[in-house]
Amino acid sequence: MIQMQSYLDVADNSGAKEVMCIKVLGGSKRRYAHIGDIIKVTVKDAIPRGKVKKGEVYDAVVVRTRKGVRRPDGSLIRFDGNAAVLLNNKQEPIGTRIFGPVTRELRSEKFMKIVSLAPEVL
């Protein structure tokens, strides 16, 4: 459950290490983002010579949350931290590698690239 001012780890090699959610996209009254939702983020910590710089604003898709996701069979997939993957203007990932597991809920048409790059799909 990600809301404004939430800090997330970055699960790709775009150069950002930590981002902060500044808006949950999808309507003016939308408060929380879950796995698979697109949020607007600002880069709070980045490595030198990376593709992104501190202070820049990007779209990102949430790939892991502490809250987790409930499956139709009743099981709950939950993670140790919140993580996101940065997206460009065409909603494609900026990085070329994904770190850590992602969930099957990302298997929509929009995020198949992220699922194919991920080392593990839960």
Curated annotation (Swiss-Prot):
One Pfam family it belongs to: Ribosomal_L14
Keywords carried by this UniProt record: Ribonucleoprotein, Ribosomal protein, RNA-binding, rRNA-binding
GO cellular component terms listed in the entry, alphabetical order: cytosolic large ribosomal subunit
Superkingdom of this protein's organism: Bacteria
SUPFAM superfamilies (UniProt xref): Ribosomal protein L14 (SSF50193)
GO MF entries: large ribosomal subunit rRNA binding; structural constituent of ribosome
Keyword Manganese attached: no
One record GO biological process: translation
Keyword set includes Oxidoreductase: no
Record PROSITE patterns: RIBOSOMAL_L14
UniProt-listed InterPro entries: Ribosomal_uL14, Ribosomal_uL14_bac-type, Ribosomal_uL14_CS, Ribosomal_uL14_sf
Subunit (UniProt): Part of the 50S ribosomal subunit. Forms a cluster with proteins L3 and L19. In the 70S ribosome, L14 and L19 interact and together make contacts with the 16S rRNA in bridges B5 and B8.
Primary role: Binds to 23S rRNA. Forms part of two intersubunit bridges in the 70S ribosome.
PANTHER family: 50S/60S RIBOSOMAL PROTEIN L14/L23 (PTHR11761), LARGE RIBOSOMAL SUBUNIT PROTEIN UL14M (PTHR11761:SF3)
Family under the similarity heading: Belongs to the universal ribosomal protein uL14 family.
Protein name: Large ribosomal subunit protein uL14
Phylogenetic placement of the source organism: Bacteria, Pseudomonadati, Pseudomonadota, Gammaproteobacteria, Lysobacterales
